[in-house]
Each structure stands twice: as C-alpha cells, then as structure tokens.
C-alpha cells in the first residue's frame, strides 16, 4: 500500500498529497472532489456537465453496440477515475469516453473493435464534437489507452451496485409485484447514478442500499420484513453496517439533483410565445390606411386577398363610401374580376353600374365603339346573369384584322339565326 502511495505521489504531483490516503484507493470526500485537476480553468457547473456528457456518451455508444450493462458501468467508472488526475482541457471528454469504453470491453470480455466504436461515435456527435478525435481517430484512442492504464494504475476490476441490488432484493418479503417494481426503479437509479460522482464517494453496496431506499419511498413500499437478521432495527443493517439514514438521504439527493439539472435547460414557454407573434407581420405589409380601420372582421378575410393583391387595391377604390358593407360586397365582386380582368367589365354587371356612374369618362369611350359593332349582330342584348363572362371580346377588333373577325361575326350570326329558327319551331 505504501508503494502504491509513493508511485501516485511521483506520478501525479501535489494533487495526491491533498487527498486522504487512509481511505481506499478510489474513494474521496466531497471536499476533495471540489478541488480536482478536472476543474482547472473550469467552473464546477461546467466540470459536472462535462462528466455527465461523457458518461451519457459512453452509455449511448455502448447501447448501440449491444454491450452489457457491466461493460458500460466499468467504462464510466474508468472515465470518472481518469479525470480525478487530468484536466478536461488537456484530454477531450469524447475521446476519453471512447477509450474507456474500448478498454472496458476488453476487461469485461465483451470486446469491440476500435473502428466500430469510432464509427458509432461519429453517428452520435456533430462535426464540432467529433473534431476532438483529430485527423487519425484510431491513433488518438490507442495512444490515450496507455495513459488511461497508467492513470488507473492497472486496477481494472470494478464492482457495481447491480449485483448487490439483485442479491438484496431476494432477501425482502412482501408482494412480489411491489418488490419487482421496487427493483426496477432502483435499477434505473443505478444507471442514472453513473452520471454523478457517487462511484468516487461510496462503495457499491452502500449505493445499492440507497437506491432501494429511494425506490421504496417513491413506490410507497414500506420494507418491514426480511428473511435474515430479524433483530436489526433497520432493514439495510443486514447488508451494510453503520450506515445512518442521513447518509442514504444524501445519496438520494445527489441522484435527484441530476434530474433537476436536466430539466432546467429545457424551457418550452418562450418558444410558444414567439410562435404567436408571427401572424401579425404578414398582415402588416399589405395593410394600408383603409385596411387598419376594421380590426375585428378582416383577420379571416385578410388571408384570401394575399393571393391577388392587385384585386384588393381595386376594391378599395370602388367602395370607399360604405365601409360597413365592404366585407359583404367583396365576396361577390371578386369572382368576376378574377375571371375577366378587362377594364370595361362594369358594363356587363348590373349591380355595379351605380359605381361607374360616378365616373362617366372611362365607360363613355368604350360604350359607343362596342355598341356600333354589336348592334347589327346582336341587337338589344338581354342582361346576362350575374358573374357570367360575356360571349364576345370586350373591345372592338382592329380594322387591319377586319377580314378574319368579320368572318367570325358572320358565323356567329348564322348560328344565332339557326337557334332562333329552332326556338320558333
């Protein structure tokens, strides 16, 4: 034991001199965990986040590769032990995580090729994160493996709370369904505890008892009967000795704090408020002085004129007098305007003859020319139904194209004569 202490002092410098060497090799107090080389040039919150991200990275990569839970827990334990002596600035967390998983696979007899681990890591990380592996990722992992082995002093065998949890659960009595539910929840807490530094503070037996205590409180399962040591005051005293309730509650709080830290960076209310603000801007660009006056009714009808903005501008000039009746008239007046965009349409629409009467100049020029050409062919034309397009062109044909147009008009005359004869019959 003394030789191991001397080697650690010679290898890792003054940091190990500040640790309590009376404890086992891989367990420290909280005061020692607050001053580690991993926190150099980092605040405690960032250092804790790096540890969580590295542990989750190992868990995700190992899960995709189909590795056993013992292999994942061993790799995460190597990860935490490595950063008790090194800095995150000097050794990137994702490269270290891949190296720890690679070594843990060989130790737990579930080896995976380094290229497979790197390939899986590439699928999980973005370009910035994967840039930590450098130009030759495999060489980075292989070189770091030697540093990892020297850091953990070739102490490769690691025990985990899983086996103790299953062993202790068999000693409990009661409803089997409740006991099974308790074990399942406690198993989940063990997985989550790997993202914390509990494996650097307490033995796996104590962590197993703590997660059972927490699961029993949450499941409302009071553990009162057990198979051995009925003389014990508390149920966990048959498994571990001299463990007060305060210690178990402290471990439980460290696990629960992990969930609270994960919920803080997920605010969902601000994005919902931002989504409610975009609807007003689309109405602002086409909105004019007259469009802002009726705020209650236009919202449902502002979306329809967006497809035809010129028609909306014309509608504003046609009916500026009666604003309350504008929404009812817009629906009927837009249909013929979309079908025939020619200017002299008000002549063939009886309901809109009142509006062009106020402006006699434009229709006066188009009416005599159209009447001179249509009177000999049609005579007095009956009023067309509202919304139906006129059968003939609105403007008179030019003189230079008189030949073809005259033939067309003569054919129309003959067709109408035949129709009149059929009606008389």
From Swiss-Prot:
Record field: compositional bias (Low complexity): 366-377
The job of this chain, per UniProt, is described as:
Regulatory subunit of cyclin-dependent kinases that mediates activation of target kinases. Plays a role in transcriptional regulation via its role in regulating the phosphorylation of the C-terminal domain (CTD) of the large subunit of RNA polymerase II (POLR2A).
Gene null: resulting phenotype: Morpholino knockdown of the protein causes unconsumed yolk sac, small eyes, deformed head, reduced lower jaw size and curly spinal cord at low morpholino doses. High morpholino doses lead to embryonic lethality.
Major location category of this protein: nucleus
Top-rank taxon of the source lineage equals Eukaryota
Q: Does the keyword Cell cycle apply?
A: yes
One term under GO cellular component: nucleus
Q: Which family does it belong to?
A: Belongs to the cyclin family.
Identify this protein by name. Cyclin-K
Source organism: Danio rerio (Zebrafish)
Q: What keywords are annotated for this sequence in UniProt?
A: Cell cycle, Cell division, Cyclin, Mitosis, Nucleus, Transcription, Transcription regulation
């Amino acid at each position: 034991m003394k030789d191991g202490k001397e080697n650690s002092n010679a290898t890792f410098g003054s940091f190990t001199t500040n640790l309590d060497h009376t404890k086992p090799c891989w367990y420290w107090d909280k005061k020692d965990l607050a001053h580690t080389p991993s926190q150099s040039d980092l605040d405690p919150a960032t250092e804790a986040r790096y540890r969580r991200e590295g542990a989750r990275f190992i868990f995700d990569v190992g899960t995709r590769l189909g590795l056993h839970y013992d292999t994942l827990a061993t790799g995460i334990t190597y990860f935490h032990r490595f950063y008790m002596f090194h800095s995150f600035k000097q050794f990137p967390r994702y490269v270290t995580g891949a190296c720890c998983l690679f070594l843990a696979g060989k130790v737990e007899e579930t080896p995976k090729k380094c290229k497979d681990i790197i390939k899986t890591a590439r699928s999980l990380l973005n370009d910035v994160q994967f840039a930590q592996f450098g130009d030759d990722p495999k060489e980075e992992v292989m070189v770091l493996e030697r540093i990892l082995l020297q850091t953990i002093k070739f102490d490769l065998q690691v025990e985990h709370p899983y086996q103790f949890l299953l062993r202790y659960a068999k000693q409990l009595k009661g409803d089997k369904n409740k006991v099974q539910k308790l074990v399942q929840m406690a198993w989940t807490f063990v997985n989550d505890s790997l993202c914390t530094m509990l494996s650097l503070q307490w033995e796996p037996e104590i962590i197993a008892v703590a997660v059972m205590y927490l699961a029993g409180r949450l499941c409302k399962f009071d553990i009162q009967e057990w198979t051995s040591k009925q003389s014990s005051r508390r149920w966990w005293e048959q498994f571990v000795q001299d463990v007060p309730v305060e210690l178990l509650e402290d471990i439980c709080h460290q696990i629960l704090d992990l969930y609270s830290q994960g919920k803080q960076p997920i605010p969902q209310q601000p994005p919902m408020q931002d989504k409610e603000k975009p609807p007003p801007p689309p109405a602002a660009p086409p909105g004019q002085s007259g469009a802002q006056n009726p705020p209650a009714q236009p919202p449902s009808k502002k979306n329809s004129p967006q497809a035809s903005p010129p028609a909306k501008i014309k509608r504003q000039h046609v009916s500026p007098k009666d604003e309350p009746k504008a929404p009812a008239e817009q629906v009927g007046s837009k249909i013929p305007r979309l079908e025939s965009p020619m200017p002299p349409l008000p002549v063939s629409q009886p309901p809109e003859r009142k509006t062009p009467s106020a402006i006699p100049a434009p229709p006066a020029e188009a009416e005599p020319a159209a009447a001179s050409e249509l009177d000999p062919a049609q005579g007095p034309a009956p009023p067309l139904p509202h919304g139906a397009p006129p059968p003939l062109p609105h403007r008179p044909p030019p003189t230079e194209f008189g030949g073809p147009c005259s033939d067309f008009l003569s054919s129309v005359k003959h067709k109408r004569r035949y129709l009149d004869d059929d009606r008389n019959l």
